[in-house]
Swiss-Prot record:
The lineage of its organism: Eukaryota, Metazoa, Chordata, Craniata, Vertebrata. Transcriptional regulator. Recognizes and binds to the DNA sequence 5'-GCG(T/G)GGGCG-3'(EGR-site) in the promoter region of target genes. Binds double-stranded target DNA, irrespective of the cytosine methylation status. Regulates the transcription of numerous target genes, and thereby plays an important role in regulating the response to growth factors, DNA damage, and ischemia. Plays a role in the regulation of cell survival, proliferation and cell death. Mediates responses to ischemia and hypoxia; regulates the expression of proteins that are involved in inflammatory processes. It comes from Xenopus tropicalis (Western clawed frog). The gene is egr1. Residues 137-203, 287-308, 378-422 are annotated as: Disordered. The record marks R305, R316, R320, R326, R344, R348, R372, R376, R382 as: Interaction with DNA. This is Early growth response protein 1. Residues 382-392 have a biased composition (Basic residues). A zinc finger (C2H2-type) spans 307-331, 337-359, 365-387.
Length: 498
């Protein structure tokens, strides 16, 4: 009686088909005992190593090899190939709606009879394999040995494989991969499938994601803005960079606005800012100008000054556009001209030019009177006015000195040319004049003499016995001639002499 050792990894689909073509079948008496022994033994993968002693027929390579010579190796290879083909076709046919495969692992011994022709042995074999289901699922480890044919067949269809090998120096059935070795190969078709879907989900994921982000581009666009390389970059962006792409899309929105819209918005914004700045600064600058020039006359009539200031509170008009531009800078506070030496800004270019002269020391404007040089023409003009005021003061001082000289010369002449035996008295100069009466025995003509208040007056007290004509002639002639010159310059005062 010969014995054979078998390791099998089969599915319910292979229970009836592969073993139905065997030429010989074992007897029915030994299967109940074998099944009972395998159920009672908790270590199913180590069943043969623990229960079968050494020296038995399981490990003897010589015994039993002659009895199985009639089993050709071609029959087993054909069975293996046909079984793999059926498994592949069934697995592809039921790939969409198949259940997880069940793996049955077991080792059993066969004692075939040479003259037996019973073909009903797969039925007790099915009961044997069904009894080993729990033991196969509970065993965490098994022998890792496998033949090249079993590894090649398991790589093609891992969950369903059955390989056999016939050799003179080895048992009929070779060890097949057990559950722990086949579990990494069984579940990659199931567990990596959702993982593969998750990893490959990046391919269909961007199409629903980027159209949502592209909805933000619903603004008026010019075809020149849409460059092909930008669209290609959007399609190549991965799902991890999607938030940054959304941020870039928001930042690119203003650049996709038409140029006409940008220009209109910029013009409107600049006008609004100009109005705000003008109204704000006009409250600061304009009142001072209005107080300084309340009714400022203009040499040019209004119809010849077409450029008016746009500020509401300013009524200035200009005949040239550049003058209006310089004036608007007063309201806006714009200072586009900058000194490169001290970095000071100016609103007018001529102010910058005169400012640079303070750094260079250039003074092109010289005074015509004293020769003093100035950097600005208005400074020279202001300096010239100083000279004019000084000249006027000198002229005012020179006029009273020239007038006082004839008065002083008149006083001694008047005193010497008036020989009066009557005692006379000279009073101090007074600002007022009054008449001095002269008493005579006959009426005498009245003589009017005009002279200023600065001159001295003569007062004569007494009665003369000589003719009054002498007094009149000697007194009136020099006085009238001398005082007539003084009446030209000063305001006259009238003295009546009787």
């Amino acid at each position: 009686m010969a014995a054979a050792k078998t390791d099998m990894l089969v599915s319910p689909l292979q229970i009836s088909d592969p073993f139905s073509s065997f030429p010989h079948s074992p007897t029915m008496d030994n299967y109940p005992k074998l099944e009972e022994m395998m159920l009672l033994n908790p270590g199913a993968p180590q069943f043969l190593g623990a229960a079968v002693p050494e020296g038995s027929g399981f490990n003897s390579p010589v015994e039993g090899s002659e009895q199985f010579d009639h089993l050709a190796a071609d029959a087993f290879s054909d069975m293996s190939l046909s079984g793999e083909k059926a498994v592949i076709e069934s697995s592809y046919a039921n790939q969409s709606a198949r259940l997880p495969s069940l793996t049955y692992t077991g080792r059993f011994s066969l004692e075939p009879a040479p003259n037996s022709s019973n073909t009903l042995w797969p039925e007790p074999l099915f009961s044997l394999v069904s009894g080993l289901v729990g033991m196969a699922n509970a065993s965490p480890s098994s022998a890792p040995s496998s033949s090249p044919s079993s590894s090649s067949s398991s790589s093609q269809s891992p969950p369903l494989s059955c390989s056999v090998q016939s050799n003179d120096s080895s048992p009929i059935y070779s060890a097949a991969p057990t559950f722990p070795n086949s579990s990494p190969e069984l579940f990659p078709d199931q567990s990596p499938q959702p993982f593969q879907n998750a990893s490959t989900a990046s391919i269909p994921y961007p199409p629903p994601a980027y159209p949502v982000s592209k909805t933000t581009f619903q603004v008026p666009m010019i075809p020149d803005y849409l460059f092909p390389q930008q669209q290609g970059d959007v399609s190549l962006v991965s799902a991890d960079q999607k938030p940054f792409q959304a941020m870039e899309s928001r930042t690119q929105q203003p650049s996709l606005t038409p140029l006409s819209t940008i220009k209109a918005f910029a013009t409107q914004t600049s006008q609004d800012l100009k109005t705000i700045n003008s109204t704000y600064q006009s409250q600061i600058i304009k009142p001072s100008r209005m107080r300084k020039y309340p009714n400022r006359p203009s040499k040019t009539p209004p119809h010849e000054r077409p450029y008016a200031c746009p500020v509401e509170s300013c009524d200035r008009r200009f005949s040239r556009s550049d003058e209006l531009t310089r004036h608007i800078r007063i309201h806006t506070g714009q200072k586009p001209f900058q000194c490169r030496i001290c970095m000071r800004n100016f609103s007018r270019s001529d102010h910058l030019t005169t400012h640079i002269r303070t750094h260079t020391g250039e003074k092109p404007f010289a005074c015509d009177i004293c020769g003093r040089k100035f950097a600005r023409s208005d400074e020279r003009k202001r300096h010239t006015k100083i000279h004019l005021r000084q000249k006027d003061k000198k002229a005012d001082k020179a006029t009273p000195v020239s007038v006082a000289s004839p008065v002083s010369s008149y006083s001694p002449s008047a005193s010497t040319s008036y020989p009066s035996p009557v005692p006379t008295s000279y009073s101090s100069p007074v600002s007022s004049a009054y008449p001095s009466p002269v008493h005579s025995s006959f009426p005498s003509p009245t003589t009017a003499v005009t002279y200023p208040s600065v001159t001295s007056t003569f007062q004569t007290h007494g009665i003369t016995s000589f003719p009054s004509s002498i007094v009149t002639n000697s007194f009136s002639s020099p006085v009238s001639s001398a005082l007539s010159d003084m009446s030209i310059t000063y305001s006259p005062r009238t003295i009546e002499i009787c």
